[in-house]
């Protein structure tokens, strides 16, 4: 199982992939099942304190009951239930403080930045201006000061030093004079981040009941401040679980969960000035956040507030006429959602000592309802809506889904023979309704309603519907607790396919041999358990994506009814229908061994192969044809790997205990076949037959020319038959771009976790570490800091070793204003890392103390999440996503928290 760090945005969650890429363009997400019924709600709406157990089902046999929706694995969540007896009350409180979980990228300070920019201007004067090296320094300083390439603003208002630029930097050495003093120094990223944002959570639960009826009721509140100023997340939630044995032949129960989520968010994952993670990280250190007077002192308004500098005279690369810190306060991004989930079941039968013994009929119904509303507001004074005097967009969405199944089971044991048979029917329905409107033109700022704006610029509404109907069956058999066999068959019908291809047939078989229960093993006492298991099955997948969103009408043509044509209405076809579209199939083979040795060591090793055929993809088309693409079954892919689990009770049955759990996984991915053409290229990525999915595809660097400082590349010529010639070195970027090569992928060679749990009397300590070895990352932030050519952007400290003079030996080429760069293998960073993810220390007060004051138990805790990350590049988050790219996203946060847990 692989997880990403996800966004550090409060309330956001991580992504999960089970055993590699399941498809080329379909959803990779596993199915979440809560209390036996598939769950479509927000995972963040479930209070972790309400969860009793969580289990991951990986192979086809284990997940067969969940059909097509479980093709990418199943995560089973069971919530807490009540117990018979008197009412038990549990109270929990946690208080924490957060900070950045990863350090910042190493960038240049004011002096280093100006020295680097000077070198860039100087190189430009020599290469493009025809100026001699002896005079280029003086010319560079003049160009920095005035003219079309000036970067210091009017009258050098953005020169942070107490000398004019022509006096500040030596034109020969390129160094800032030693006696220069800073007039101001402000860090945009520091100004954007909150100092020690707080997190507090409170939970109260009540459980109890009789022998016949049991209940659990809980309430929770979470208040989490974001690391980025103005961002936050609040959650109010309640859960009620009831289970009742109504008669000796009828059991029934229900669970209901309500959650109110409220978020103030911020733009992320984009290279736009409205994204603070982009603008603040890339703002050169010479530009102040607040206006400065002639002496470099901050300017204040009549109310004593510092006046933001909106950069009217800043260069374009420094977000001219924009202050991204000000937009944190002046703009608004808010969402609210009400999440309601319900589960109801009734189970009839299993009458003892009758011919109906072992026969049960159960009915399960579960629904998930999400009503959400969001608002995006851009102020009229600063930012991207100044020209239209501000913008407001409001949107509402309603998601409703339900699953209804009826299951008939027969479970009997005859001597050493145990049979369990199941047949059932299931229906799943999903509906999504969306409505939004956008207006511009406000008389002044701070108005967050549509009525306050004057001009309607957009209005949109749409509805998505989706349904799946299934008939399912399963047979389990075991003999003498030694031999286990299972088989399942189901047929699923999906509304995403045309009627001729709507139904898919899927099946699985599996077996388990408990070798340790054989008579010939009876004398081997040090083997407590030894099992050999194997399974094979085929599951279906219909979850094709359109971009990052689900495509609910996969086989049909799409029409754009909002096509711009003055005041005339009409429709334009945007994608083609494909009635031949059919189920994607995942064939899973799993072979494993489980062992328990010396009553101390447990181990599991599994080898798996997952072959995907008829892969679903939104296939790209040439835009000249008038269509973006169409949906198609495009080929096949294979994942193979090994999962290893090792648990050791290093010390047990003593006052001090120590348990060590090691997890390790490998995965190898190969695209076996693509329809129509052997490869699909997208920027620096390629999907090619015979290679790993989403392989990096870039030019190959061949060093830096010591004489000129130019980047060199490996290239080759191709003859008329397409045969590649011998490689040679060139400085021609166009040639290098035409000679791209596969440079690896994000997929690691080995990844896993290490968990240590220590206990001594009332104390317990757990330390969870995760690791990944191998794979590569294309870090967009680092590469922009290193190769970005916009004047006004911050620069990486790595540029200190960039080429400057003939004879320099280095791996970083000369820097030059306006010079373009291409992505090479030098841009890829080793993705290996080791992270201490969680440290939890607890102390349970002695029970006799608690009993004396009427408490059952009391526990004190201290927890640290995202403690430290060790990797190959300071500032990089190699856990960001599964494809190996990084963007300007909300950094993950480290949280230190303290709590108390009382039961009475």
Predicted regions and their residues:
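Glycine-rich, aromatic-lined ligand/substrate-binding cores of catalytic
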Residues: 745-778
